[in-house]
Amino acid sequence: MKNKWLSFFSGKVQLELTGRGIERLLNECTRQGIPVFHVKKKKEAVSLYIQLQDVHAFRRVRSKFKCKARFINRKGFPFLLLKSKLNIGFTIGFAIFFILLFLLSNMVWKIDVTGAKPETEHQMRQHLNEIGVKKGRLQFLMMSPEKIQKSLTNGIDNITWVGVDLKGTTIHMKVVEKNEPEKEKYVSPRNIVAKKKATITRMFVQKGQPMAAIHDHVEKGQLLVSGLIGSEDHQQEVASKAEIYGETWYRSEVTVPLETLFNVYTGKVRTKHKLSFGSLAIPIWGMTFKKEELKHPKTEQEKHSLHFLGFKLPVSYVKEQTRESEEALRKYTKEEAVQEGIKLGKQDVEDKIGENGEVKSEKVLHQTVENGKVKLIILYQVIEDIVQTTPIVRETEE
């Protein structure tokens, strides 16, 4: 296969030999190092092929013999190139047509979204437009499907998951939205108790009989709203419903190092564009003869398959970015480390109490410096939801 391609690119010619001394001519060609191949005998003539580069040497050898040689065929890239020069207009037109067809085969012509509500789909298309994913855009100049998926998931709140699949000239997206909990059609009778020890700061009862009031100190499991309403003779069971917030306390232990070593990007980036044929990558843009060394380089690659008329080609476009990074040392004084520890502890508490909770204040109970680290014990004053529902259990008379 390799010799076949070499023969094509170097060019070959077919000769027809007639007359006497043909065998001696072929033997002399072998002695002179002139490759002769595809030798065929036809009655009184012999046809054979030689490389284009050996034509002059063959003529010198043939002049010593009485046989005649006639060129009957020419094959290979040099002759195709010669024909294209003679038909330059056709060649340029064909090249432009091929390039346009190739570009059209690698554009996005449709973005298909399934599983999303109209409002969500509108938000998605706006977001896609902002990040450069739109109709008429070349696929290898866009983000990879994985990065599109990550950008959509992070950029649109009401999406739980989105699958992005590029097929031909169409981007298919399957969406799973965040479902709001369905309203309960029927809720069994229940009480509301305190889920932890607290001081009630806010209380709004929609259903049920209040059994506590604002500023009351309540213990864990204490009844706050009863599901039994009405007089003793005519009691009715209902599903208690209320918003009750109380003041609680969280104890947090945090450790902050005084010195931290980490990597940061300097802003220097080297970008290369390549065509990949399997394991072979050929640079097409971004190569510099003056190579500036990048310290602690980190390389990322984006690979895009190329298509032609719906068929995947055995070649890919690769965008390679090499970023320079350097080690940076972050130092804290003891006071700065304490403030950072308070902030980290607050974030941890906020994650536990949810978005409706609120951290009112904090107090550092204990702080020590050991082995280059500040260790803190912090108490946070918090306002949070203390509602916990329990079923109504009535005592049965024996």
Swiss-Prot record:
Record field: transmembrane:
88-108
**Keywords tagged on the record:** Cell membrane, Membrane, Sporulation, Transmembrane, Transmembrane helix
Q: How does it sit in the membrane?
A: Single-pass membrane protein
Question: What InterPro entries is this protein classified in?
Answer: YqfD (IPR010690)
Name the Gene Ontology biological process terms. Answer: sporulation resulting in formation of a cellular spore
- Assigned GO CC terms: plasma membrane
Q: Where in the cell is it found?
A: Cell membrane
Pfam families, sorted: YqfD
| Family of this protein | To B.megaterium SpoIV.
The protein's name in its UniProt record: Uncharacterized protein YqfD
Q: Which organism is it from?
A: Bacillus subtilis (strain 168)
Record gene name:
yqfD
